[in-house]
Amino acid sequence: MTQPNTQTTPNDVPAAAEGQHQEQQQQQRRGGGRERRGGGRRGDRRGQERDSEWQERVVQIRRVSKTVKGGKKMSFRAIVVVGNERGQVGVGVGKAGDVIGAVRKGVADGKKHLVKVPLTRHNSIPTLSNGREGAANVLIRPAAPGTGVIAGGSIRTVLELAGIKNVLAKRLGSKTPLNNARAAMVALASLRTHKETAKERGISLEQIYS
């Protein structure tokens, strides 16, 4: 009676060992994927934080029409003010077939036309300034701490999103929200700090204050 041969050779690798090896490789791949995906999420969070720095306010939404060959084409126009309340503000206009699309385009347009506003320690403006756009004329002047924003309409929105806390503004001429907002932007863009004014005039700061 012969006994069966139970001797194993090096080529007879157990199937279970191969399965464990494949599982380890799959876990490593999944781990690497999680790390890569984690980096993507961190990048998305940074982008969201940058976007959260900006505030958006809709000044006006109007339904407008354009006469074409087939008749009138209706759309929406949105006037949007964008600012970070730290000295940067912009006014944008967007047109689209729906309100959401018009506002989105207005925000993008406002970020393309940002103006840097010099602010004082008391969150006011350094000097008196005047801006004109079309038939609208806007006069803004600095105010003492605790005064607040004395302005109305779209001018107030522009000043608040620029981060100005104490200011006086007067609207002269046209009452159109878009022209008034753009006139306020012209006035803010023409502002200069005392140091810049002294350098342009070629005099010292002491002469500016005297």
UniProtKB/Swiss-Prot annotation:
<dbReference type="GO" id="GO:0015935">
    <property type="term" value="C:small ribosomal subunit"/>
</dbReference>
<dbReference type="GO" id="GO:0019843">
    <property type="term" value="F:rRNA binding"/>
</dbReference>
<keyword id="KW-0694">RNA-binding</keyword>
<dbReference type="InterPro" id="IPR014721">
    <property type="entry name" value="Ribsml_uS5_D2-typ_fold_subgr"/>
</dbReference>
<dbReference type="InterPro" id="IPR005324">
    <property type="entry name" value="Ribosomal_uS5_C"/>
</dbReference>
<dbReference type="Pfam" id="PF00333">
    <property type="entry name" value="Ribosomal_S5"/>
</dbReference>
<dbReference type="Pfam" id="PF03719">
    <property type="entry name" value="Ribosomal_S5_C"/>
</dbReference>
<dbReference type="InterPro" id="IPR018192">
    <property type="entry name" value="Ribosomal_uS5_N_CS"/>
</dbReference>
<comment type="function">
    <text>Located at the back of the 30S subunit body where it stabilizes the conformation of the head with respect to the body.</text>
</comment>
<protein>
    <recommendedName>
        <fullName>Small ribosomal subunit protein uS5</fullName>
    </recommendedName>
</protein>
<dbReference type="InterPro" id="IPR000851">
    <property type="entry name" value="Ribosomal_uS5"/>
</dbReference>
<comment type="similarity">
    <text>Belongs to the universal ribosomal protein uS5 family.</text>
</comment>
<dbReference type="InterPro" id="IPR013810">
    <property type="entry name" value="Ribosomal_uS5_N"/>
</dbReference>
<dbReference type="InterPro" id="IPR020568">
    <property type="entry name" value="Ribosomal_Su5_D2-typ_SF"/>
</dbReference>
<dbReference type="InterPro" id="IPR005712">
    <property type="entry name" value="Ribosomal_uS5_bac-type"/>
</dbReference>
<feature type="compositionally biased region" description="Basic and acidic residues">
    <location>
        <begin position="32"/>
        <end position="56"/>
    </location>
</feature>
<feature type="domain" description="S5 DRBM">
    <location>
        <begin position="54"/>
        <end position="117"/>
    </location>
</feature>
<feature type="compositionally biased region" description="Low complexity">
    <location>
        <begin position="18"/>
        <end position="29"/>
    </location>
</feature>
<dbReference type="GO" id="GO:0006412">
    <property type="term" value="P:translation"/>
</dbReference>
<dbReference type="GO" id="GO:0003735">
    <property type="term" value="F:structural constituent of ribosome"/>
</dbReference>
<keyword id="KW-0687">Ribonucleoprotein</keyword>
<comment type="function">
    <text>With S4 and S12 plays an important role in translational accuracy.</text>
</comment>
<keyword id="KW-0689">Ribosomal protein</keyword>
<feature type="region of interest" description="Disordered">
    <location>
        <begin position="1"/>
        <end position="56"/>
    </location>
</feature>
<comment type="subunit">
    <text>Part of the 30S ribosomal subunit. Contacts proteins S4 and S8.</text>
</comment>
<keyword id="KW-0699">rRNA-binding</keyword>
<feature type="compositionally biased region" description="Polar residues">
    <location>
        <begin position="1"/>
        <end position="11"/>
    </location>
</feature>
